[in-house]
Swiss-Prot record:
Pfam families: Lactamase_B_2. Belongs to the UPF0173 family. SMART domains: Lactamase_B. The lineage of its organism: Bacteria, Bacillati, Bacillota, Bacilli, Bacillales. InterPro entries: Metallo-B-lactamas, RibonucZ/Hydroxyglut_hydro, UPF0173, UPF0173_UPF0282_UlaG_hydrolase. Keywords: Hydrolase. It comes from the Bacteria. One of its GO terms (molecular function) is hydrolase activity. Transmembrane segments: none annotated. This is UPF0173 metal-dependent hydrolase BCG9842_B0515.
Length: 227
């Protein structure tokens, strides 16, 4: 399994001959190296409905005939836009031809915000994502605060690689993310959701230096880890 980081919370996984994108916020993302028009993808996994995570999902899904796996309300909302979706919910798992997906808790919000019409559409509960393929498991925490059931995620799953938000303000900050890493007990931890906007500026290298009992790695956009 090859796992690549593409800025903010964008993660690409190549496994079982398929390409999977998590939270493909590409257009308007100053930290990504990807252009939506160049992306080939078989499946898109979404943690929640905010614009900096849904991003280019509709365009990518239609262009590539990709399935979008998302929490039920968000999947329904996207299906109304002509997207092929597979709805799930927290605690549920499903085996796809590209791998196994399980949604975990995340403490955040989830909505589609239409600035032009000043409307907010509820898109269900936010989620974290456990993805398993080729006997390896990746945990993408989505946007979340620290919560004690992260201990349970670590107890019930053998996590090989975890992506944790460290930006603070909208998610947990570096200090809480250090504790999250301890509880999740992943072999390797990569920081995400930082330095995209001024309000979430952080030093990822200081974060990885504070990690204990795991390997911390800062990935620049386009860099990857092979599991």
């Amino acid at each position: 399994m090859k796992v690549s980081y593409h800025g903010h919370s964008v993660v690409k996984i190549e496994a079982n001959g398929k390409v999977i994108l998590i939270d493909p916020f590409l257009t308007g993302n100053p930290k990504t190296d990807l252009k939506a028009e160049d992306v080939k993808v078989d499946a898109i996994l979404l943690s929640h409905g905010h614009g900096d995570h849904v991003g280019d999902t509709v365009e990518l899904a239609k262009k590539n005939n990709a399935v979008v796996v998302a929490p039920f309300e968000l999947a329904t909302f996207l299906s109304w836009q002509g997207v092929n979706t597979h709805p799930m919910h927290i605690g549920g798992s499903h085996e796809f031809d590209f791998g196994k997906v399980k949604f975990t808790q995340a403490f955040h919000g989830s909505s589609y915000i239409d600035e032009a019409n000043k409307t907010i559409t509820y898109t269900g509960m936010p989620a974290g994502i456990l993805f398993t393929a080729e006997e390896k498991t990746v945990y993408h925490a989505g946007d979340t605060a620290l919560f004690s059931d992260m201990k349970l995620i670590g107890e019930l799953n053998k996590v090989d690689l975890a992506f944790l938000p460290i930006g603070d303000n909208f998610t947990m900050g570096p200090e809480d993310a250090v504790l999250a890493a301890k509880w999740i007990n992943s072999k390797t931890v990569v920081p995400m959701h930082y330095n995209t906007f001024p309000v979430i500026e952080q030093d990822p290298y200081q974060f990885v230096e504070k990690l204990q009992n795991c390997t911390g790695k800062v990935l620049e956009a386009g860099e990857s880890i092979t599991l």
